[in-house]
Amino acid sequence: MKRRTFLQGGAVAGATTLVAAPAIAQSMPEIKWRLTSSFPRSLDTIYGTAQTFAKYVAEATDNKFQIQTFSAGELVPGLQALDAVSTASVEMAQTPLYFYIGKEPALAYATGAPFGMNHRHQESWWHFGGGADLTNEALKPFKAHAILCGNSGTQMGGWFRKEIKSVDDLKGLKFRIAGMGGHVLAKLGVVPQQIAGGDIYPALEKGTIDAVEFVGPYDDEKLGFYKVAKYYYFPGWWEGGAMLHMIVNDEKWNSLPKQYQVIVNQAGAAAGAWMLEKYDSVNPGALKRLIANGTELKAFPQPVLEACYNATQDHLNELAAKSDLFKRTKESHDAYMKEVLFYTQIAENFYDNYLLSKTRSKT
């Protein structure tokens, strides 16, 4: 029987030993699903995660369960992935849930709230702090549920044609930004634009937008933003550890054999780890290339960050006052963040800062 590469990982081997047995694999039905992504095929990080996920599922079932992946626009536009799953036009989608905060604001926390947790703490909250249950409660009206399948790590703050020296420079700025960060910046005069990944560069090139945030150096380099915007800001305070999910139609999910459900969940975990590790391997080199090509790195000024932080708290509190689900999700997230940061500030931050002091001059 074909060797299943994703089963070699310790995190998934135990949960999938049973379904890997030849007799069981032979007894499983042949099933074909379609997966639509919100991202272009050119992004071998994010879209590559969808392909890796589908590959793992196929390998673990001896190709009995095949998931065909489609990039944004091939079946449905990138921003309509949740709708496609909800109506069962496709069985599943790869999409960041903060794309749909217009439908349910609490979904912001599923990807990551502004000034929220880093990637590891965010995923810990998902598994152990109630994040998954709260998200799936939010998705229930859409007849779907979420499987965690990736994280970008802390993102960059975006590409700007002009420098951001003060809060006044934000006023009137047409900024492509997804999720709750755009709502926060609107309070400071920004005109947020939500545009799917494959459509961003033309909008920036034509001047339809003045600035864009997407992910980080590697993906941003691939999409060519450095060709039309000189200043590259950090940090992406609206995405401290952005989670990515597979959204599955509940009826289609319930029709799967239990063994296939186990494989899908574990393939999501394995592909998600692959995604974060991929970013760690490719972002440093991409950032060096961008700098060599004339990109100017800029940190957001402290007064700008303070204004954004205060506007974030005001906005999140306003939403919590209007929605019980948002309030419960916010309280769960904030309590978990406070708890994990208690330890992080003692051990990890001290270690990381010391190590940076020893290596910074060598990079």
Enumerate the predicted regions with their spans.
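N-terminal secretory/targeting leader peptides
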Residues: 2-19, 24-122, 130-363
